[in-house]
Amino acid sequence: MRTSRSSGAVPPRDAQSKNLKRISTMAGAYGLRNYTVRDIRELKGKRTLVETLAFTPEEAAAAEAAGIDTLKVRFDPKSPELAAEIRQAAPHTFMSFSLPLIAVTSPQEALRLAFSAMEIGGDAIMCQWSPRFIQALAEAGVPAQGHVGLVPRKSTWTGGLRAVGKTSDEAIELYRQIKALEAAGAWAVEIEVIPQQILQELSRRTSLITSSIGAGSGGDIQFLFGEDILGDGPGPFPRHSKQYRNLYALRQQMQAERVAGFREYIADVQSGAFPGPEHVINVDKAIVDEFLEQLDKEPR
């Protein structure tokens, strides 16, 4: 039912024929999505969804056009405009906003920041916060995803940037962390760089949607960063990733072409080749003579 607080046009009723769901965001904006939290939960153990993290609106638009199931997007509270632009670039894709670890110091601040992200159209929140913070989000109805395994910003606790869960003690600790997230009300968990066999067993034993990055198959979602998929960086890339394109080489080629173009321009100016006859405007000699005659009468 439409209310006075909702914004935008009511989504068309034929959305289902396009495999889209009619939704309202937490801020009251109508929209269409490929999935809802409930849809993804119902797919657990039935089909592996495909996820990427988009860094730019162009990446997000390409991901949606390609058929990526879900997106993660970094949300910077100091400049939320980029996240909003990415949301607009992929309006129909289920999108979780990843919130910075050290941006908040209490559950109340965490909830306030989560609401800020949901206000621009987030479908869920991804965070590396403790279960106590996640509980605050869950109690307010915000779908929250936790993070276990190699959590880079907390890697001092696990011995640096390395695989986690290669011993039975570490694997049991992962299980306990996941159960704590369950108890806090999380709906999903990102599991990073753990043994594939451990992921498979963990995913079977939790109601949470498991998003695997560097943890092999067996999770509910397979996740890689967009820049890793597209080879959009100088490398080295993470061992767990695969590069399907080499956009970095294309960017380097474009930069080389920029430099070459500027150098040719400089050379043409210095040699007198530019501007040429086709680049300038001419007038009759009579006009020039008349101008010079008038110019001589002007005060110097």
For each of these PLM feature ranges, what is it?
Residues 2-300:
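Alpha/beta enzyme core
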